[in-house]
Swiss-Prot record:
HAMAP family: TmcAL. Its EC number is 6.3.4.-. It comes from the Bacteria. It comes from Bacillus cereus (strain 03BB102). The keyword Thylakoid does not apply. ATP binds at residues 81, 142, 167. Belongs to the TmcAL family. SUPFAM superfamilies: Nucleotidylyl transferase (SSF52374). GO terms for molecular function: ATP binding; ligase activity, forming carbon-nitrogen bonds; tRNA binding. This is tRNA(Met) cytidine acetate ligase. PANTHER family: TRNA(MET) CYTIDINE ACETATE LIGASE (PTHR37825:SF1).
Length: 393
């Protein structure tokens, strides 16, 4: 955050944040409302939600949804982390793919026919068409997402400029603490769910406000969220489904339904299920997203109705600082998408999916807390934060 503000000299900072489930196909550690508080306390001025129909998708769709929201908010500059760290290389790579599109698509198909996952096939295709000196390494996850941000900016004819900050010390998938002050999200999540875990081990790797809110959430609700807590619901659902039922679920294709129904029979945990399910063709993240859609019963028809090839249909405002509120007041007449301060009365196919996802997310809570949280989510107004006093209003 500090580096972003230093690099962009921004007047205000806006964060587009996933809701209950994340792009890598797993539940968020804590609710979006607690994460909104974390963002505001760390210097963000506006927090808006990326709908489930975009947030639990491959990088291209995820980026397209996020950029469309930022465009609607008239953002002038975007900043993202990457393994490469040179923004020119991202533009070079997008240009190279466009110029070699026919060759690129042929190579992707060729590598997929050889049994590779789409992500691996794409990475190999890029290696064949790109010069390594002026282009990014498309095998790295943050580079992939950054590439899609630039592609979305250009495809949406946006005037938005882009900057990138190089990741260092810790890589995306690192599961151990390799540095005294920097750790990957994967590593932090693993630590939080390890045996005899405590917040002490991660305090030096995350902002003080984040650590405090994580501890508060666990104290108030008795849990942090991960896939294992949903496994019994997930397994029960699969036990009641036929291959035909599964084929209607989004991202279930090419015979995957039979493999899923076979492997769930002998799996006693989500991790063991994933270990049994994964193949060279399907990445762990790709499979986790498919499992998320099974858990939330998100069908191909629902995603089709959500029209994810277009821009996000609304802006769900989750939180704002005083400065953020001023920005919205000054620019609200220019913002063409509806801004939702709650979802109780708004109706849209994308929001139907969102409501299901929220319901599933809170399903691990005990009653009556579960019902209270779900009802509160629909009527919850944006969190307000006074940055001068560092207090929530």
């Amino acid at each position: 955050m500090q580096q972003t503000k230093k690099l962009t000299h921004s007047d205000i900072t806006i964060a587009v944040m996933s809701g209950p489930f994340l792009q890598r196909g797993e539940p968020a550690l804590v609710s979006k409302w607690y994460r909104t508080k974390m963002a505001l306390a760390c210097g963000v001025d506006l927090v808006v939600e990326l709908p489930y129909a975009f947030s639990t998708q491959k990088a291209e769709t995820f980026a397209n949804g996020a950029i469309s929201i930022l465009n609607a908010l008239h953002v002038s500059e975007i900043c993202f982390g990457s393994e490469d760290g040179q923004i020119e290389n991202f533009y070079n790579t997008v240009s190279a793919q466009k110029n070699e599109e026919e060759t690129f698509n042929r190579l992707v198909k060729q590598f997929m026919n050889a049994g590779n996952s789409y992500a691996k096939a794409t990475s190999e295709a890029f290696l064949h068409i790109l010069s390594s000196e002026k282009n990014i390494d498309m095998s790295q996850p943050n580079n992939i997402l950054g590439f899609q941000y630039i592609k979305a900016i250009l495809m949406q004819n946006s005037s938005m400029q882009a900057q990138t900050i190089k990741r260092f010390a810790s890589h995306y998938h690192d599961e151990t603490f390799n540095d005294q002050h920097i750790a990957s999200a994967t590593c932090i999540r693993k630590q939080l769910f390890s045996e005899n875990s405590s917040f002490t081990e991660i305090e030096s790797f995350i902002p003080k406000a984040t650590a405090s809110l994580l501890a508060s959430y666990k104290q108030n609700y008795g849990t942090l969220h991960n896939w294992e807590q949903y496994f019994s619901f997930f397994k029960y659902k699969l036990m009641t489904m036929s291959p035909e039922d599964l084929r209607h679920i989004y991202e279930i294709e090419e015979g995957l339904e039979h493999r899923i129904l076979s492997k769930i029979q002998t799996s006693s945990s989500f991790h063991l299920f994933m270990e049994a399910l994964k193949t060279k063709r399907y990445t762990w993240t790709r499979l986790q997203r498919a499992c998320t859609h099974i858990l939330t019963n998100t069908t191909k028809e629902e995603i089709h109705c959500a029209n994810i090839e277009q821009h996000a249909p609304y802006i769900r405002l989750l939180g704002m600082s005083q400065k953020g509120q001023t920005y919205l007041s000054k620019n609200k007449k220019k913002i063409e998408l509806p801004i939702l301060t709650h979802t109780k009365t708004f109706d849209h196919p994308t929001l139907h999916i969102e409501r299901k996802a929220n319901s599933v997310y809170f399903s691990i809570m005990k009653e009556p807390l579960r019902t209270q949280l779900l009802k509160r989510d629909a009527t919850h107004h944006p969190i307000r934060y006074d940055e001068t006093t560092a207090k929530f209003l």
